[in-house]
Amino acid sequence: MRIGHGYDAHKLVKGSHVVLGGIKIDSEFSIEAHSDGDIIIHSLIDSLLGAAAYGDLGTFFPSEDDKYKDISSRELLKEVVFKLKEDKYQISNVDVTYVGQLPKLNP
């Protein structure tokens, strides 16, 4: 059994929305990032990559590579899951916690 721990943080800037867990949420802020800036999926990806000893998100998907510009983090997650399956890894459980003041997620 392998265990990974993922983490992601981005700067908030004036904008129109954020993407969290693949869901677009209207907001007066946006997350500054090369991709869609989905910190929930980025953290999950980072954890999966770490558990498999593949490096981190920035190594696997470098921000200098224009093919990842504005890409949906869901697509990045699909690539990682495909690579894990290809290498015979099996994901048995994940747990993600969002810590942030904005956007407010409570009803």
Segments predicted by a language model, with ranges:
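Extended beta-strand/beta-hairpin segments
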Residues: 3, 10-14, 80-87
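Acidic-glycine-rich active-site phosphate/pyrophosphate-binding loop
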Residues: 9-24
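A short glycine/serine-rich beta->alpha loop
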Residues: 25-35, 63-68
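A generic structural signal for residues located within well-ordered alpha-helices
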Residues: 35-40, 72
